[in-house]
Each structure stands twice: as C-alpha cells, then as structure tokens.
Amino acid sequence: MKAVIILGLVLLSVTVQGKIFERCELARTLKRLGLDGYRGISLANWVCLAKWESDYNTQATNYNPGDQSTDYGIFQINSHYWCNNGKTPGAVNACHISCNALLQDNIADAVTCAKRVVRDPQGIRAWVAWRNHCHNRDVSQYVQGCGV
C-alpha cells in the first residue's frame, strides 16, 4: 500500500511539471506546426524566444502584479491581451482561447496563438525576451545539429 501511495505522488509530481522540451525536439515540433519562416521569422528565432521565455517548459507561468495579468506556457503568452484566464481585468482574448490551453504538452494551440501575436504590428517584438536575448544576435545555435 505504501508503494502505491509513493507511486501516486511521483506520478502526480510528473503530471504537474508538464513537458519540458529538448531544444531539437522543440525545433522539429515548431517546424512541423508551421513556424519556420512564418511572417519572416526564422525557426531559430522561435526556439530562442521559447528558451528565454519559458526554458522550453509548457507549464511555465508568470504573474504580473502591475496589470494583474499572467503569462502562460512555452511562449509566455499574456492573459491581458491574448487569452482568457477568467481573472485578468479588461482582458481582450485576441486568440479566443483559454489560457489553460497554452499550458498543454501539445503546443499546437500555443503556436496558433503565437502566430496571431506576430500578425500584430509589433510582430515578434511583442516579446521582451526576444528583444533582450535574440534580436540582432546569431541565433543559429538554437537549431544547430537539429536537422531542421
């Protein structure tokens, strides 16, 4: 009985952690989901963005006390503008999606919403982490050796 309880706790902790992608696994997944070259943005830039926003973690969240919004998922998509968490005052929900959908191991919804974000005038510049860590830098290392 004790072993069953311990196993249950281990499985619960794995479930809560979510998926943390390996760099090349993420590159292949993003390519398959159509981000390579989307709106002129290279695959390496998308992988760089995910590295610095979430460290490739689908379950990453970050609360922003200033506007009471939260950033969700592998791309840290914000609840004030892009998704609905039912808590953020004045939320727009431009992606027409629940923020919880952005925390799934299957990142198809997160990719669809990221595509919506970059269609706005700011494009990929909407992400501070991209501006601080990827913009005007050699980002080829993020896809090097991945065969993509």
UniProtKB/Swiss-Prot annotation:
Pfam families: Lys (PF00062)
UniProt EC number: 3.2.1.17
Gene Ontology terms: biological process: defense response to Gram-negative bacterium; defense response to Gram-positive bacterium; killing of cells of another organism
SMART domains named among the record's database cross-references: LYZ1
Record's subcellular location: Secreted
Reactions the enzyme catalyzes: Hydrolysis of (1->4)-beta-linkages between N-acetylmuramic acid and N-acetyl-D-glucosamine residues in a peptidoglycan and between N-acetyl-D-glucosamine residues in chitodextrins
Domain of life according to the entry: Eukaryota
Alphabetic keyword roster: Antimicrobial, Bacteriolytic enzyme, Disulfide bond, Glycosidase, Hydrolase, Secreted, Signal
Disulfide bonds: 24-146, 48-134, 83-99, 95-113
Active site: 53, 71
Signal sequence residues: 1-18
Domain named C-type lysozyme: residues: 19-148
Gene Ontology molecular function terms on file: lysozyme activity
Matches recorded under SUPFAM superfamilies: Lysozyme-like (SSF53955)
Database matches in PROSITE patterns: GLYCOSYL_HYDROL_F22_1 (PS00128), GLYCOSYL_HYDROL_F22_2 (PS51348)
Cellular-component GO terms for this entry: extracellular region
InterPro entries associated with the record: Glyco_hydro_22, Glyco_hydro_22_CS, Glyco_hydro_22_lys, Lysozyme-like_dom_sf
Function: Lysozymes have primarily a bacteriolytic function; those in tissues and body fluids are associated with the monocyte-macrophage system and enhance the activity of immunoagents.
Other known facts: Lysozyme C is capable of both hydrolysis and transglycosylation; it also shows a slight esterase activity. It acts rapidly on both peptide-substituted and unsubstituted peptidoglycan, and slowly on chitin oligosaccharides.
Complexes and interactors: Monomer.
Similarity-based family: Belongs to the glycosyl hydrolase 22 family.
Name this polypeptide is given: Lysozyme C
Organism for this UniProt entry: Miopithecus talapoin (Angolan talapoin)
